[in-house]
């Protein structure tokens, strides 16, 4: 009854408690968190009204902000509080709140539409941006994280970034909006790995090791056990446990970046050729302990950001790579630099919850050397052991590296705002060739992930 009442009066009340997010060429607000949360609002009304214009509006907002401010790796956009015209370089950042709200919206858009685009985008943010915004032990986070970020300190970097204050340090007492909000990131992600489908089946929409109990077919309860180290591994394995034989469709998302994906059921290859960017469906009678294996080959690829000085990013499957920068962690008193409205608990022991500032111990101002005809021909992927603590998002623990060649760009330095300066021009003088190492940008709390480059 409530739902039908809303449908009948939708035109009158849709914007009563929020702004109008259906404008075709402008946004009602340029705050990163508002955008990450509210772009899904029209699609929510589409679920009640069936008006396809509402669904189209949500897609439009997602694309609109990225056409200008999101020409960077990591899945987000430059809005270090608010997006500002002229501030589109990858040294602009986004709030940790914005990262997890984007993930949550992607997950809800996935549920509303079934479009694999939203699963893939959620993975891009989850693997490449969110992990670097927090300390490995989750006892501190920074308000702003950028695709190119070579300092993480307690200084005020305005107007290099939009907001005024100590927003780049890993401070557990400061920026309480993010302290509360970021904890939704991984739990909501886990919640949306395995989804029900309208035909009484089940879909593996996003990938991570998990166990799920679901109802399929005529209401039969089964469990799925997923085993993988994805996105650091190409193979994902599922075990189906069911008390009796049951028929249902099992959907597997095939990412758009893979070529030659293969699926095996109980060791036998499924005949169909899975299409990248779509779902593969296995519709059969399932028995207890049936095994499903999907292999998603990963290759090196490159994106060019033309509006940002033709900078490039290097991807390996769903992972975007960043320069490996040795990090110097400096412990600080969290109370000394927390912003005024933080209001931490009175009995909080600052010695147990220190702030960390992070500084570069090795040079960061490299251009990538690309091949003229085959840009990535000299790039080599190196696989390392899986970390003993099961946390792959640090410089020391990441199990994947890429060896490459770089040249230093002497003019690319820390600027007057104590930030990594904007990308240099393509013809900026460069130094001698050096071997450099790239690591997944989610493991790099200091990072260069959009590179100047030279083709040789």
Q: What kind of feature is each model-predicted range?
A:
Residues 1-8, 12-13:
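Single conserved hydrophobic/aromatic residue that forms the stacking wall/gate
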Residues 4, 30-47, 94-110, 179-189, ...:
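Well-ordered alpha-helical segments within folded domains of soluble proteins
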Residues 47-68, 89-139, 149-150:
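Catalytic-core region of carbohydrate-active enzymes that cleave or remodel glycosidic bonds
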Residues 58, 119-128, 133-241, 275, ...:
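C-terminal beta-rich recognition modules with glycine/proline-rich loops and embedded aromatic residues
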Residues 228, 240-244, 253-256, 284:
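Non-cytosolic beta-sheet module surface loops
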Residues 245-265:
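Beta-strand-rich binding/interaction modules
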Residues 248-251, 282-297:
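C-terminal beta-strand-rich structural cap/linker in extracellular carbohydrate-active enzymes
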Residues 258-283, 302-307:
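Solvent-exposed beta-strand/loop surfaces of large extracellular or lumenal domains
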